[in-house]
Every structure is written in C-alpha cells, then in structure tokens.
Amino acid sequence: MALLQISEPGLSAAPHQRRLAAGIDLGTTNSLVATVRSGQAETLPDHQGRYLLPSVVNYHASGLTVGYDARLNAAQDPANTISSVKRMMGRSLADIQNRYPHLPYQLQASENGLPMIQTAGGLLNPIRVSADILKALAARATEALAGELDGVVITVPAYFDDAQRQGTKDAARLAGLHVLRLLNEPTAAAIAYGLDSGQEGVIAVYDLGGGTFDISILRLSRGVFEVLATGGDSALGGDDFDHLLADYLREQAGFSDRSDNRLQRELLDAAIAAKIALSDAEAAHVEVGGWQGDITRSQFNDLIAPLVKRTLMACRRALKDAGVEAQEVLEVVMVGGSTRVPLVRERVGEFFGRTPLTSIDPDKVVAIGAAIQADILVGNKPDSELLLLDVIPLSLGLETMGGLVEKVIPRNTTIPVARAQEFTTFKDGQTAMSIHVMQGERELVQDCRSLARFALRGIPALPAGGAHIRVTFQVDADGLLSVTAMEKSTGVEASIQVKPSYGLTDGEIATMIKDSMSYAEQDIQARMLAEQKVEAARVLESLTSALAADAALLSAAERQAIDAAAEQVRAAAAGDDADAIKEAIKNIDTQTQEFAARRMDQSVRIALKGQSVDEV
C-alpha cells in the first residue's frame, strides 16, 4: 500500500508502474544510497565504483565539492571543509562547543541560538551541509535509476531525539527529497537480514563505525521493533584503531618528529592499509617513510584489545538497561566497517555466546535495510509480502458496555494520527476500567478483531458517571498504535502498544470491509438493541442505588408503581425488541420523576441546613 495512495485493499492506482525509491544511510563518517532492482537490494556506486561517499563537504567561493574530493581538502583548507556534521544535527551552538571544543570551523549563533558555520560559501547551518550530502547521494541514485526519486527512507541513530530527527527531515526537503520515513539504523540492519519476519525475541545491533560505537538492544514482537536500550561511545571507532597502529608503526620505524604532518598522513594511510590486510591475512608488510617491516594480526590484536573491551562494557550496560541477559539475545547484527576486524567479531561472539551475522557487508547493511523499506513504502511490494500502514485499513476503537464497539479512528485515516474520546464509569464506586482495543467495521465486539486489553486502575470512587477517562489512540508513521487511558482528575494512566497490521493479510482486510457492508442493516439493528439494553441496565442500577438511600420518600403506592415499572424494564431487556425496551425505559422515567424531584429537594435542604438567606 503506497504512502498517501488511498485505495481499497487489493487495488492499485497503477499496478504496472514501478516507482523509484532509495534508502539512504546518512552516516557520520560515510554515507551510502541503495535501491531495490529486480527484487534485490543493492548499494549504488559512483563512477569510480566506490560505494561509500565520505560525509564531507568543502565550500569555496565558486561552489562546493562533496565526498572524496572534499576530503582531500581537509588538511589544507580545514575551516571550509565540514565533516561529521551529523554530530551537530539538532544541537545548539553551546552544546556543540561543549561537546566538540576543538572543531576547526568558525562557529557563530543564529538569532535562535542555532549553530552557523562561517565558510567561503557563506554562513551555513548543519541542515544545509547535510542537504548537500543528500543531494550528492540523490544525484547518484537518479542517474543509476534513470529517473527522479519518488521517495526515500533515511536512517538515523535510535537515540536521535525529535530535534535531530526533524533536522534530518528538513535537510532532505532542502535537498528536494520526499521523505517516506525516518528509520532507526539498528532496525534497518535487522530488516536487511530479514529479522523483521523471523523469530520473535531480542536482537542486538553492534555498530562500530569510523568515529563512533553504538549498541542497540531491540525486541521484535508481533511485527514491531521496540528499542529496549541504546548505548555506546561517541569517541570510539575504527579511526582509533588506525591511530594506535600508526603510533606503533612510528615507534617501530624510529620516527621521532611528530610535527611532520605529511609523515603522519603516510603513517595513517599505511596503518589503514595494514588493518584491512590483517582482516584476511595473519601478517601484513608495511613500507612507510623509507622504513619497511611486518606486523602480525596478533600484534594488532594486542593494540586494539582494550578498545574492543570498551565496546563490550557498553554492551553490558545496554543489556542491563534493557533488563535482559546476553544469552537471551537471539541474533547479533554487525554494522560498520570496523566490524570486519577479526578480533571484534571473535570477542562479540564470545560475549553474546553466538556467531554474529556478518554475511551482508557491514558498511552497506543499514542502507540495504532502508532500501527494502523504501521499496515497500513507495508501493512496489505486493501487499501479500508485507503490509505497512500509511492509511488505516480498518477502523480502531474500544469495547463499550453491552459488547459494542466505539470507533475512535475510522478506516482510511492517513497516518500519523492521534484521536481521543472521553468515557465515564458505569457503576457507583467503580475504581478500575478494562480497556479492550478493537479493530474492524462491525458494530459488535464479537464481529471485530481483538487487538489488546489492559486495565486502568486507581480511578476515584465516585458515583456512576462521575469519573472521566480520556482514551487516546495514536498511530505513528510506522503503523504502531499506542493507546493511553487517563483519569482526568488524578492523572493516573495506563497504556499499551500494538501493531494493528500484524498478522492480517490484504484478503482478510477486504473480507472484513465487505462483511461490514453486507451486514450493515443487521449490525445497526443489533447495535440499537444492545444500546437499549445498556441503558436499561444503567437505569435499573441507578434506581437500585436511589431506593437504597431514599425509599422513605415514597408512599407504598408510589413504591409499588416504580417496582412494577422496573420489572417491565427487566422483562423487556431480556427480550430482543429494542422499541419495547425504549418504551419501558420511558415509562420508568415517568414513574420516577416525582421521586427524583423529592431527592433533589432533600439534598438541597441538607446542603443549606444552618445557613441564613444572606449566606446563600
């Protein structure tokens, strides 16, 4: 079901037309773009066959360069070469200066306190820089696909807050892209491995990139990925491996001059090449600055072991925060180029007690997952493969007294959406309310689909109808329904989350809609009967309470007439004639009008007892 393409299940506005979509991994160090072609997700290379695009932009008076060309200018033009801009996204100038005090850029605050970077191309904010990276990726995709993109899915870290996510969306819009969805990076990686349709349980995503380390603990339940905990180290990554190895090579070669920037660059390049070689070989030969020698994998492992241990400490903290044990983790997904290092894979496997998933290139796995999601959201996947909600296909509501369904969000409402309704207690002194979340178009609970149940407790003990409970239904962009019930006077609340689309095929949805039409008249009659029965029960409940408190206000004849009317209501409510119940309720209302007036007068006299006219 395509985003914003509202149609009946099983129908498509243009079934022959394939829309162009891409998944974008907008990374701190490198970015990638991927798409689905011929049913396979693939990352798209540049003209030199390089899949990674360094997340670097160099601004100069005549324009800008992005990627590898921009990175070459970092040494000689640091003030105008912006890298790792993702770290600045959604942050204030003060926050950035506190976190990253050694940035080579000239920063200043805008009127609203947001950071602006002074460059040869003018004052720029992080959103604009990110937009320029996105433009370069989009250009690569449009050239490869020979057409403009209909939409993109962009990945973001699971810990990104609303401001950071909004900044990412704004950058995409500035780049001229239609954002289908922002997708959490660990979720994208899990989707790439097909874990979204596999065994339910806990999944760990270990993401060791060039400059940062992130660990995410997810729980997959009924088609929903829930982020249980995140952690990591924003100052630890594969770059640290490179610098340790470069320092080791400097020591082995006897180079003492640390002011030689050119030599430092050569050492770093040699270290990177050796690290890559040691992923496949037990030893690597190094030549740098006139020195040559060998380094073994064992030596390299000794250098980086403390850093790998730090990542595992972060994993341990994340598991503790999530409230799960390492042995409960079903799968471990490896993300980031630095997870190619054999020691990393070995130690992670030992820590979690299982072999990590590494069959997909760890540099590409997030982009591939985003591409798969984009292909679905843009409308290229048949509904039978995966149903994602962009309009609500079936109404969502609650069970009310009498087995009725009160619709809160009607079908074909576009998402995200939030709706609320108020309900009251049915009985005197009621202190709890059962919330039964329903899905479907029929009028009765028995004909709709049960999604979830939960209870709201701690309601003040008041007369029937005295407590007011506000029930809010909220469906996010991923089709995840959150239902929250709150008692208004106390603020006590309870909530639950559920994926309405989980386990439903398109055919089942169509059948449910068809049935609602076929049985419409019958359902309305059944609803009217049920409503009258509920009203009858309410009237009798109220009458019982009133008689228990104030029967002395009635004469024997009046009491007999009321009892007879009540019995008439009970008899009618036991039958299936809604009109008969309605007439019986009307009759008892007539019989009790004088009783109600006397009770009101008595209450007023009690309330005013001992007060003078002036006081009143």
Curated annotation (Swiss-Prot):
Record's signal peptide: none
UniProt entry keywords in alphabetical sequence: ATP-binding, Chaperone, Nucleotide-binding
CDD domains linked to this entry: ASKHA_NBD_HSP70_HscA
Statement: the UniProt record of this protein carries the keyword Nucleotide-binding: yes
UniProt-listed Gene3D superfamilies: 1.20.1270.10, 3.30.420.40, Actin, Chain A, domain 4, Substrate Binding Domain Of DNAk, Chain A, domain 1
Gene Ontology biological process terms in this record: iron-sulfur cluster assembly
Source species, domain of life: Bacteria
InterPro entries named in the record: ATPase_NBD, Heat_shock_70_CS, HscA_NBD, HSP70_C_sf, HSP70_peptide-bd_sf, Hsp_70_fam, ISC_FeS_clus_asmbl_HscA
Coiled coil: none
Recorded GO MF terms: ATP binding; ATP hydrolysis activity; ATP-dependent protein folding chaperone; unfolded protein binding
SUPFAM superfamilies the record matches: Actin-like ATPase domain (SSF53067), Heat shock protein 70kD (HSP70), C-terminal subdomain (SSF100934), Heat shock protein 70kD (HSP70), peptide-binding domain (SSF100920)
Function noted in UniProt: Chaperone involved in the maturation of iron-sulfur cluster-containing proteins. Has a low intrinsic ATPase activity which is markedly stimulated by HscB. Involved in the maturation of IscU.
Family of this protein: Belongs to the heat shock protein 70 family.
PANTHER family documented for this protein: HEAT SHOCK PROTEIN 70KDA
Name the UniProt record assigns to this protein: Chaperone protein HscA
Gene behind the chain: hscA
